């Protein structure tokens, strides 16, 4: 018997809504990355994007343990000479909470073309409202 290999046009995708309120950032992100990759499905195939869509709401209320708010940073470069920048988690949570969750999940996905394709299925919103009601997403309780 041959092993099953999913084909991109055969993959059925679901939509899930995850409430980030009170959830720990790293634990939440690893669960979301698993769903985006499709590793929770029996038809998982490493070279095909078999994952589902994930909508994260209440990103502004995500929890960070310890002193991570002040001691952890995301580093990026503007592309100009001397353009290395760092932003603390506290500042990021205050200004753009969506990017905090987005970057945490991004770091847990493959750094390839397929990983970038998987990341397009992640939708993050700071508040409780989202604009994907037409897709009839299922509420997903993580942890």
From Swiss-Prot:
Superkingdom, natural source: Bacteria
Gene Ontology cellular-component annotations: cytosolic large ribosomal subunit
Biological process, per Gene Ontology: negative regulation of translation; translation
Pfam families: Ribosomal_L13 (PF00572)
Recorded GO MF terms: mRNA binding; structural constituent of ribosome
Keywords, comma-separated and alphabetical: Ribonucleoprotein, Ribosomal protein
InterPro entries attached to this UniProt entry: Ribosomal_uL13, Ribosomal_uL13_bac-type, Ribosomal_uL13_CS, Ribosomal_uL13_sf
Gene3D superfamilies xrefs: Ribosomal protein L13 (3.90.1180.10)
CDD domains: Ribosomal_L13 (cd00392)
Protein family: Belongs to the universal ribosomal protein uL13 family.
Function noted in UniProt: This protein is one of the early assembly proteins of the 50S ribosomal subunit, although it is not seen to bind rRNA by itself. It is important during the early stages of 50S assembly.
Quaternary context: Part of the 50S ribosomal subunit.
Protein name from the UniProt record: Large ribosomal subunit protein uL13
Lineage: Bacteria, Bacillati, Bacillota, Clostridia, Peptostreptococcales
Designated gene of the protein: rplM
């Amino acid at each position: 018997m041959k092993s099953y290999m999913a084909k991109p046009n055969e993959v059925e995708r679901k939509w899930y809504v995850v409430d980030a309120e009170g959830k720990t950032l790293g634990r939440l992100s690893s669960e979301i990355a698993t769903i985006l990759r499709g590793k929770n499905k029996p038809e998982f195939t490493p070279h095909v994007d078999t994952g589902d869509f994930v909508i994260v709401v209440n990103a502004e209320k995500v929890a960070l343990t310890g002193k991570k708010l002040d001691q952890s940073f995301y580093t990026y470069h503007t592309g100009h000479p001397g353009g290395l920048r760092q932003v603390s988690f506290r500042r990021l949570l205050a200004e753009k909470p969506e990017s905090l969750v987005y970057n945490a999940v991004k770091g847990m996905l493959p750094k390839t073309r397929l990983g970038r394709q998987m990341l397009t299925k992640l939708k993050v919103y700071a508040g409780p409202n989202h604009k994907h009601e037409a897709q009839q997403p299922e509420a997903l309780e993580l942890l």
